[in-house]
Design a protein with these regions (language model features):
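N-terminal acidic, glycine/proline-rich low-complexity segments
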Residues: 1-246
Length: 246
């Protein structure tokens, strides 16, 4: 049997990252070492609580570490401190506009808490004591990882690979030239790109080709499990919001 691939997820959990956590945890070929939260689509308290809610739905025991609440450098543009509200759209028959990323996922409040150690120190401690066999998978701003690299540059030699979602070649989602995860903390992105670590970038051009539709959402819901329902709820929310943004 092939050895499981050890990964640490770094997330700014909304509906998309919730599915990423569930997918990673349930993949038989992955050993989910931990999940670290960071400010991004929503401020840190929301992304952290959402991560804990997903863990509860999974009935999992992987540790969750709270990370950085702001970008590495002072605010240069509005909303770069996790105050980004995302796109909103008004849906006929509904009083309030729908946000792509709501503050809280529609899951029960978490009954558990994060680890006491900060995510940055967790990265340093874990990687420095590892055998170089851990892959980092950030799907939000790169603040936590970049900060750890600045504090202890030696961790770069211990990272097996960084597989990140960020950037775009022909697609953007924040400005005419920027994808959100890079835009939210470009200094952190520069540090990670210059780290010398093996890096694979999954840009918007790729993620926008990995579509999921209403039929697949219904199939998840038909599983009749808490996780199936949670995935379907996340997908249905995005379908509803995006269908009114087109």
């Amino acid at each position: 049997m092939a050895e499981k691939r050890k990964i640490i997820l770094d997330v700014d959990t909304g509906t998309d990252d919730a599915i990423a956590i569930m997918t990673a945890y349930l993949d038989p070929d992955i050993d989910l070492v931990a999940v670290c939260s960071v400010a991004g689509n929503k401020p840190l308290p929301y992304t952290t609580e959402n991560t804990l809610r997903v863990r509860d739905v999974l009935k999992a025991d992987f540790p969750v570490y709270r990370g950085c609440a702001t970008p590495m450098v002072s605010t240069l543009l509005p909303n770069r401190h996790g105050g980004y509200t995302g796109q909103r759209t008004q849906v006929e028959g509904m009083e309030a506009p729908i946000e792509i990323h709501t503050d809280y996922l529609e899951l029960p409040p978490s009954t558990r808490t994060v680890e006491k150690e900060h995510a940055v120190w967790f990265y340093i401690d874990t990687l420095m004591h590892s055998e170089g066999d851990i892959t980092l998978v950030p799907v939000g701003p790169l603040t936590n990882i970049a900060m750890a690299m600045r504090i202890e540059p030696e961790i770069c030699k211990k990272i097996k690979e960084i597989v990140l979602m960020g950037g775009g070649y022909q697609r953007t989602n924040t400005t005419a030239a920027a994808e959100f995860n890079i835009w939210a903390d470009p200094e952190a992105a520069q540090i990670v790109m210059d780290s010398g670590c093996p890096i694979r970038i999954i840009p918007l051009d790729a993620t926008h080709r990995a579509c999921i539709n209403a039929d697949e959402s219904r199939a998840f819901r038909a599983l009749g499990t808490p996780v199936g329902k949670a995935v379907a709820d996340c997908v249905d929310h995005r379908i509803l919001a995006y269908s009114h943004l087109q």
